[in-house]
């Protein structure tokens, strides 16, 4: 007999151990002979990471699919692993050194510092893997990989050297996102925009050959900027070619204030005639758009910042070129050189004002890009870096999605994928860090570069080049973390070696990931997979949405609305969290997570536990020779039919990535049909004297529960595994753990039995609804009058008389020609069901109560409708607040409809 309650905290570790002992998650476990492979690679979490709600959703979805396909007998591999997370890991260890008052990395030296990171990884790096196991992730943990382990490092070397020799990796001077605190280039995903209240400064740039007069607008052009310090690097002013105001000036120069550099006025579509003066200052070395304008118009790129974002003028050859070093300019150079960018901004504005070049200052709120780890504003920065020719690699990656070899689900993301791929920029893959894959490039005395897999090979190449042995210096940069991640689908399977795993599991079946890394990871895996394997890395990409708080707001520490999945698992168990995420994971829709929902789905687990316990108390046990088609009782044939339908819906839902529909189908069958109705129908049979009926009911209930455990296992693996082991045939053990049991393939359906019992369910539900709407006391027993019933309906009433009276609290059923006075009515098929209310409730008092309720609802609806009609409210309120009001309005409209129905019934009855 089951314990009275299910203890998730005590059971989950025990079940995890059972799976481990059974080897249930090993590649190929439980596979049928000759089965098709089903392979999934986990999006590797950062080694520094702790499980967050995004991980919980992502890995729940993967685990649902993996457990489902494993039970269907496929040859399953779920490949786990962890990302070395360059910047994040280096920062964690640097912080640890500072906290322990140990020498910093520079004092320690590169080699010792990297040793220290490996030591940290050995001590703390396994935390997220353990948290994923706790969630129930059924990966083949014996195959866990790390992006810096020896095998993957070999794959990275092979790819880098091959691409270099194919001319697809090269060194170039371009703009990058530069973090002046961490002193490295960072990727776009590591940049976050923050709304900052700042200013827009409007400056006067004097025209050449015209005496500058601040009072005469014909002597200057006005440009505006949010970053005045960058004007020191201006090399042009752009105007739109269609802007007639500037036609005569295009090709002439302006003189850069404070500096004296002559810079051309160029015609370029980038300039917007409607924005400000229509003229734009161009600083190619410090703005991504300006860099492109500069390339189109052959403008110089002058970098005026140090890596730390201080001004550099004194020894800056590019800045000083062609400048007349007047006393005024020398003084400016002395004053500004080495000054922090923000102090320089303030001083430059003062100087522009003093010399008549400041037109005006506007308050201006704008998005300022910050490094998400360094936390300071990043700078577009001109520097030498390593690049991948992504444009070339993108072509086959686009073709693979266009011709359907790889499908993106939901399909609407394909447009985003193509938009990005068609406009792809060279991919900057170098980082100025110590932790990561060091770039395999060595430089000779004259700077000649040798890219090889080892230092010995580089020395041999240098010897061949110079005709003698020379000293080589290795590039100190490391590769972007996304570079090694881009190889994940094949590097984890042993490439560049030709392994059996690679032959079996590549290409993988499906990739599950968030839409936010479609470009940073998915597209790059497509490029690398197609280039090196000459085959797509996955057949399907399933992109899930974000997990937000219950109001629809993005979770962030600053908002204080972060929901911790580990805390939720402590309180409700892993199954409740998983089921909640699954049933809310509608395609393309963000998950709005309310912890109250998780409590609700824990109750669902409790319902199943209690149903099993109730069944055991009534002698329900597996009958080995039970066959659905042999059941005789309509109620059993009905539940077996509904079980087949539910199985079909769950199977289709998972197979088509509609996890919410699959979970919903399982939920409705278990809670509504099996627990609320079927077990209720069985009570008189269990208490009766018909032993044959009792035995059939017991066997049917046991069979249904067995299938339910299987259907729910991908969603709620822990509880279902425990129930499976505790409900084996008397005196026997199960042949296998539930994780390796066979997925139900059911075909039994009895349309007549289903129609018959579903009619009974609809009748009782309808009568109960009317009673609830009319506030009929729960204990009151009411008569029922039936009008216009045909023979089938009359027979059904006769056949189910006892059940109707017991379940709907009905004292007698009569068939009449006319509705009695004071009766509420409902339609069921061709018949009208009348419930006389006069003796049960005070119709007048109930009408008054309903009118009052309708008034309250109408008033609140009016208030919300006015709010939503207010354009200022919709424009200025937080998105989640507006959404909450819209949702409340929908709820109120539904409530108003219910009250209107009840009022209509009262009127009819009166």
Curated annotation (Swiss-Prot):
Signal peptide start-end: none
Chain residues that bind ATP: 557
Pfam families assigned to the protein according to its UniProt record, in alphabetical order: Anticodon_1, tRNA-synt_1, Val_tRNA-synt_C
Stored InterPro entries: aa-tRNA-synth_I_CS, aa-tRNA-synth_Ia, Anticodon_Ia_Val, M/V/L/I-tRNA-synth_anticd-bd, Rossmann-like_a/b/a_fold, tRNA-bd_arm, tRNAsynth_Ia_anticodon-bd, Val-tRNA_synth_C_sf
Organism: Brucella suis biovar 1 (strain 1330)
Family: Belongs to the class-I aminoacyl-tRNA synthetase family. ValS type 1 subfamily.
Stored PROSITE patterns: AA_TRNA_LIGASE_I
MF terms in GO: aminoacyl-tRNA deacylase activity; ATP binding; valine-tRNA ligase activity
GO cellular component labels: cytosol
The protein, known as: Valine--tRNA ligase
The protein's Enzyme Commission number: 6.1.1.9
Subunit structure, as described in the record: Monomer.
């Amino acid at each position: 007999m089951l314990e009275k309650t299910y203890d998730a905290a005590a059971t989950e570790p025990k079940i995890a151990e059972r799976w481990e002992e059974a080897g249930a998650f090993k590649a190929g476990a439980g596979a049928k002979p000759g089965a098709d492979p089903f392979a999934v690679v986990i999006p590797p979490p950062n080694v520094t990471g702790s499980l967050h709600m995004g991980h919980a959703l992502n890995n729940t979805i993967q685990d649902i699919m993996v457990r489902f396909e494993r039970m269907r007998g496929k040859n399953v591999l779920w490949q786990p692993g962890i990302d070395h997370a360059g910047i994040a890991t280096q920062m964690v260890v640097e912080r640890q050194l500072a906290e322990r008052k140990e020498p910093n990395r520079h004092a320690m030296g590169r080699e010792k510092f990297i040793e220290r990171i490996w030591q940290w990884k050995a001590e703390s790096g396994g935390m997220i893997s353990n948290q994923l196991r706790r969630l129930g992730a059924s990966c083949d943990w014996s195959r866990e990989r790390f992006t810096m382990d020896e095998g993957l490092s070999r794959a990275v070397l092979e790819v880098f050297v091959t691409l270099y020799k194919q001319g697809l990796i090269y060194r170039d001077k371009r703009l990058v996102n530069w973090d002046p605190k961490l002193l490295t280039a960072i990727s776009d995903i590591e940049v976050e925009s923050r709304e900052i209240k700042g200013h827009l400064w409007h400056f006067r740039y004097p025209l050449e050959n015209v005496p500058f007069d601040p009072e005469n607008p014909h002597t200057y052009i006005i440009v505006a900027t949010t970053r005045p310090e960058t004007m020191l690097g201006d090399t042009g002013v752009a105007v739109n070619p269609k802007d007639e105001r500037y036609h005569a000036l295009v090709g002439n120069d302006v003189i850069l204030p404070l500096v004296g550099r002559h810079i051309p006025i160029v015609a370029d579509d980038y300039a917007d005639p409607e924005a400000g003066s229509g003229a734009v200052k161009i600083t190619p070395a410090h703005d991504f758009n300006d860099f492109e304008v500069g390339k189109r118009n052959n403008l110089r790129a002058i970098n005026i910042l140090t890596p730390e974002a201080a001004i550099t003028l004194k020894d800056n050859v590019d800045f000083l070129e062609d400048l007349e070093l007047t006393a005024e300019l020398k003084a400016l150079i002395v004053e500004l050189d080495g000054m922090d960018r923000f102090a320089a901004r303030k001083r430059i504005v003062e100087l522009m004002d003093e010399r008549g070049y400041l037109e005006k200052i506007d308050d201006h709120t704008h998005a300022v890009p910050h490094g998400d780890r360094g936390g300071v504003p990043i700078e577009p920065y001109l520097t030498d870096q390593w690049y991948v020719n992504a444009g070339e690699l993108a072509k086959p990656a686009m073709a693979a999605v266009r011709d359907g070899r790889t499908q993106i689900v939901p399909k609407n993301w394909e447009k985003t994928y193509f938009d990005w791929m068609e406009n792809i920029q060279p991919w900057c893959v170098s980082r100025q860090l110590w932790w990561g894959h060091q770039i395999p490039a060595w430089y000779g005395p004259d700077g000649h570069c040798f890219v090889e897999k080892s230092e010995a090979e580089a020395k041999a190449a240098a010897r061949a080049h110079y005709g003698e042995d020379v000293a080589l210096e290795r590039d100190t940069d490391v590769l972007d973390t996304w570079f090694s991640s881009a190889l994940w689908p094949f590097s984890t399977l042993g490439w560049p070696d030709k392994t059996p795993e690679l032959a079996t599991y590549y290409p993988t079946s499906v990739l599950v990931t968030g839409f936010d890394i479609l470009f940073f990871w998915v597209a790059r895996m497509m490029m690398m997979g197609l280039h090196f394997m000459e085959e797509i890395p996955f057949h399907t990409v399933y992109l899930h949405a974000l997990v937000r708080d219950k109001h629809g707001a993005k979770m962030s520490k600053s908002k204080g609305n972060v929901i911790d999945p580990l805390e939720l698992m402590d309180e409700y168990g892993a199954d409740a969290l998983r089921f909640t995420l699954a049933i809310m994971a509608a395609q393309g829709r963000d998950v709005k997570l309310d912890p109250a929902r998780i409590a609700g789905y824990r109750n669902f687990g409790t319902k199943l536990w209690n149903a099993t316990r109730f069944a055991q108390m009534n002698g329900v046990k597996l009958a080995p020779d039970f066959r659905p088609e042999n059941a005789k009782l309509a109620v059993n044939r009905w539940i077996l039919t509904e079980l087949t339908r539910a199985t079909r819906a769950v199977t289709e839902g998972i197979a088509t990535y509609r996890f919410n529909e699959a979970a919903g189908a399982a939920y409705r069958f278990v809670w509504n049909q099996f627990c609320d109705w079927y077990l209720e129908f069985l009570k008189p049979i269990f208490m009766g004297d018909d032993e044959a009926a009792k035995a059939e009911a017991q066997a049917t209930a046991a069979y249904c529960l067995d299938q339910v455990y299987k259907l729910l296992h991908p969603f709620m693996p822990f509880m279902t595994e425990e129930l499976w082991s505790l409900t084996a045939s008397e005196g026997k053990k199960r042949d296998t753990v539930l994780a390796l049991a066979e997925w139900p393939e059911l075909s039994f359906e009895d349309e007549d039995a289903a129609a018959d019992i579903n009619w009974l369910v609809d009748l009782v539900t309808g009568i109960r609804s009317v009673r609830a709407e009319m506030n009929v006391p729960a204990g009151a027993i009411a008569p029922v009058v039936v009008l216009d019933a045909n023979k089938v309906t009359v027979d059904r009433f006769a056949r189910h008389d006892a059940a109707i009276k017991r379940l709907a609290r009905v004292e007698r059923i009569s068939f009449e020609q006319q509705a009695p006075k004071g009766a509420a009515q409902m339609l069921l098929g061709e018949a009208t069901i009348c419930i006389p209310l006069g003796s049960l409730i005070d119709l007048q008092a109930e009408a008054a109560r309903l009118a009052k309720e309708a008034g309250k609802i109408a008033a609140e609806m009016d208030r919300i409708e006015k709010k939503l009609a207010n354009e200022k409210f919709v424009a200025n309120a937080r998105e989640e607040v507006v959404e909450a009001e819209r949702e409340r309005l929908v709820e109120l409209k539904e409530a108003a409809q219910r009250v209107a129905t009840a009022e209509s019934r009262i009127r009819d009855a009166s």
